[in-house]
Amino acid sequence: MILCSYWHVGLVLLLFSCCGLVLGSEHETRLVANLLENYNKVIRPVEHHTHFVDITVGLQLIQLINVDEVNQIVETNVRLRQQWIDVRLRWNPADYGGIKKIRLPSDDVWLPDLVLYNNADGDFAIVHMTKLLLDYTGKIMWTPPAIFKSYCEIIVTHFPFDQQNCTMKLGIWTYDGTKVSISPESDRPDLSTFMESGEWVMKDYRGWKHWVYYTCCPDTPYLDITYHFIMQRIPLYFVVNVIIPCLLFSFLTVLVFYLPTDSGEKMTLSISVLLSLTVFLLVIVELIPSTSSAVPLIGKYMLFTMIFVISSIIVTVVVINTHHRSPSTHTMPQWVRKIFINTIPNVMFFSTMKRASKEKQENKIFADDIDISDISGKQVTGEVIFQTPLIKNPDVKSAIEGVKYIAEHMKSDEESSNAAEEWKYVAMVIDHILLCVFMLICIIGTVSVFAGRLIELSQEG
């Protein structure tokens, strides 16, 4: 018996709930039918034709999809929050079961033809016709999503340490300011749901309302809302993948001058660095904006690195040529000896080349310094009279001539060897000078390319 009573109570509750749903659905159906009956969505929703429709526009930025530097297009995911009052869509909630808000298809009511003026590629107007929210006071809120591709003048002068000021210009396409007025919901777009980009960070963003008078209609204003977005690029990717490798190539080029010329690998290392740099530039060239409006910083640095490497090859050829010079082909000028052997090594703290002193060279035995007493076995004092029988001895005379020839030949070989060693020493001094000079050029060149822009960013930040 108790079980039966529970079943009855449940059945009664189910019937009452179904009746409520039917009545609620009936109220909403009747409300929508009454609102849209004789409704003309072409006519502006105003009580008098002299009145204007006041529309509040709010831009909600969801995502920065892509920045195309070459075509100067910025692709964004946005939501346009639009609010206005339609005087023909009002009702008394008491007459419709207390319903205060309903959702209607946006195709069934009047909509402002809000478009993106600086559209670059895609749809100017909103294409996703989502439902709108209607209040019993006639207030409409419509927040359709949109993918905008807006034109933005991309300035690549400071790439990859650049900032871009991009805009979105929104306005009513058909009506002038006397028919439809638009106002920004806030002086800043809504970034509460913005998804951070891995390449860009938003530094500032604002919106302004403009009254524009065109030449066709000088007395009638056309209204638009322009949103400005200042975006700063995150340069980490380009620093790690482009700038640091180029810097390493430059330092590797400097090491060419530290490599001894006798090793025979100077040109091999120089050409290898040049080929490696060329292949590297071919790989990363797609990362750099291919535009002729300006030369980006990273392009300047890559050009500097290429010139730096080629210059090192040219001067390496000069050093190798100097190293292999000989007295039979080149005579060392006095100014070269004075600068590169006597002056620069002392100034730059090089270890001077060990050469025989004049005293030692004078003490060496040559044909002109032969002691005749060593040959005759007698001590000879004073001048030697060469008409002695000793000199007239053919064997002794032949021996002296042979010793004299050998001594002169040895002297000539030693002078040639000393001259060749001097050329090698000059080449070594030039190598050390170029090592210091190219190291300074590498550091100063890198700093001069990037330092100015980095200082500007630090002051702005």
Swiss-Prot record:
Disulfide bonds join 152-166, 216-217. Glycans are attached at residue 165. It comes from the Eukaryota. The keyword Lipid biosynthesis does not apply. Residues 25-234 are extracellular. It catalyses: K(+)(in) = K(+)(out); Na(+)(in) = Na(+)(out). Pfam families: Neur_chan_LBD, Neur_chan_memb. Keywords: Cell membrane, Disulfide bond, Glycoprotein, Ion channel, Ion transport, Ligand-gated ion channel, Membrane, Postsynaptic cell membrane, Receptor, Signal, Synapse, Transmembrane, Transmembrane helix, Transport. It is a multi-pass membrane protein. The keyword Transcription regulation does not apply. GO terms for molecular function: acetylcholine-gated monoatomic cation-selective channel activity; transmembrane signaling receptor activity. Residues 321-432 are cytoplasmic. SUPFAM superfamilies: Neurotransmitter-gated ion-channel transmembrane pore, Nicotinic receptor ligand binding domain-like. Its main location: membrane. It is found in: Postsynaptic cell membrane; Cell membrane. Upon acetylcholine binding, the AChR responds by an extensive change in conformation that affects all subunits and leads to opening of an ion-conducting channel across the plasma membrane. Belongs to the ligand-gated ion channel (TC 1.A.9) family. Acetylcholine receptor (TC 1.A.9.1) subfamily. Alpha-1/CHRNA1 sub-subfamily. Pentamer of two alpha chains, and one each of the beta, delta, and gamma chains. This is Acetylcholine receptor subunit alpha. It comes from Torpedo marmorata (Marbled electric ray). The gene is CHRNA1.
